[in-house]
Curated annotation (Swiss-Prot):
Listed EC numbers: 3.2.2.23, 4.2.99.18
Similarity field: Belongs to the FPG family.
Keywords: DNA damage, DNA repair, DNA-binding, Glycosidase, Hydrolase, Lyase, Metal-binding, Multifunctional enzyme, Zinc, Zinc-finger
Protein name: Formamidopyrimidine-DNA glycosylase
Alphabetized GO MF terms: 8-oxo-7,8-dihydroguanine DNA N-glycosylase activity; class I DNA-(apurinic or apyrimidinic site) endonuclease activity; damaged DNA binding; zinc ion binding
GO BP, one annotated term: base-excision repair
Free-text remark on how the cofactor is bound: Binds 1 zinc ion per subunit.
Zinc finger (FPG-type) boundaries: 241-275
Reaction catalysis annotation: Hydrolysis of DNA containing ring-opened 7-methylguanine residues, releasing 2,6-diamino-4-hydroxy-5-(N-methyl)formamidopyrimidine; 2'-deoxyribonucleotide-(2'-deoxyribose 5'-phosphate)-2'-deoxyribonucleotide-DNA = a 3'-end 2'-deoxyribonucleotide-(2,3-dehydro-2,3-deoxyribose 5'-phosphate)-DNA + a 5'-end 5'-phospho-2'-deoxyribonucleoside-DNA + H(+)
Lineage: Bacteria, Pseudomonadati, Pseudomonadota, Betaproteobacteria, Burkholderiales
Length: 275
């Protein structure tokens, strides 16, 4: 599933092509993704200039004068920038095309767990949308600190890894990046969130930012379906310290990496480096 780094890589790849350009038309070939594609979306966007492309958590927000169209990639979704001249014929899982003068932005989603939604400007700020309003803070924002994590986890018995994944404290720390961040911070993923000290949470906040920044720089992680807007795979997974390395020696101390299951997801950690 594309997480924050993959979505940010997509945003950065798309923005130079669409910001300041007008949508000539929209071809909707599938009316039902995770939720119904809004009726009249093509009419709403025809001849509209894209003013900006933002990211909130794992959602992409395309602003036009009349509002925002919101895209979520789901588990297998991708947005590709393709040349309008010689555009490939749409395949089975190519659901929506936003057509500009010289190129096409194509949404592909084999499993159809992604979403394309519309938020009209008269409904208020897009960040108040029901899918966005309850999200945690952005990991690169000044609001994301060790003090925030410490305060929000007092009395919580859930594991620190599961607390990171929940998304109500900080957005975008998916399974890969939670395991990697906890390794960098030296925190065992099974530790109760409420028992982690403030200094350790300060290290964890720094580790989350560093891990996500490294992943973005490397184009995200490609485990199955993800490719960036240019069709290239990410390669962060090649440099992971612990994720998907069960039984292999720790890159720091040579202890074999262990794998356990938490909340039906695989967790990887070093029993020596993480306490």
């Amino acid at each position: 599933m594309p997480e924050l780094p993959e979505v940010e890589v997509t945003r950065r790849g798309i923005e130079p092509f669409v910001a300041g350009r007008r949508v000539e038309r929209v071809d909707v070939r599938t009316e039902m993704l995770r939720w119904p594609v809004p009726a009249g979306l093509a009419e709403q966007l025809r001849a509209r200039e894209v003013l900006a492309v933002e990211r909130r958590g794992k959602y992409l927000l395309f602003e036009v004068d009349a509002g925002w169209f919101i895209v979520h990639l789901g588990m297998t979704g991708t947005l590709r920038v393709l040349p309008a001249d010689g555009l490939p014929v749409a395949a089975k899982h190519d659901h929506i095309d936003w057509i500009f003068d010289e190129f096409v932005l194509r949404f592909r989603d084999p499993r159809r767990f992604g979403a394309v939604l519309w938020h009209p400007r008269e409904a208020g700020d897009v960040h108040a949308h029901p899918l966005l309003a309850s999200l945690g803070v952005e990991p690169f924002s000044p609001a994301f600190t060790g003090a925030l994590l410490h305060a929000r986890t007092r009395g919580r018995t859930v594991s620190v890894k599961q607390a990171l994944l929940a998304g109500d404290m900080v957005v975008g720390v998916g399974n890969i990046y939670a395991s990697e961040s906890l390794f960098r911070a030296g925190i065992r993923p099974t530790t109760a969130a409420g028992k982690v000290s403030l200094p350790r949470y300060e290290r964890l906040a720094d580790a989350v930012r560093a891990t996500l920044a490294d992943a973005i720089e490397r184009g995200g992680s490609t485990l199955r379906d993800f490719v960036g807007s240019n069709g290239e795979s990410g390669y962060f997974q090649l440099d992971c310290f612990v994720y998907d390395r069960a039984g292999q020696p720790c890159r720091v101390c040579n202890t074999p990496i262990r794998q356990i299951v938490q909340g039906q997801r695989s967790t990887y950690f070093c029993p020596t480096c993480q306490r």
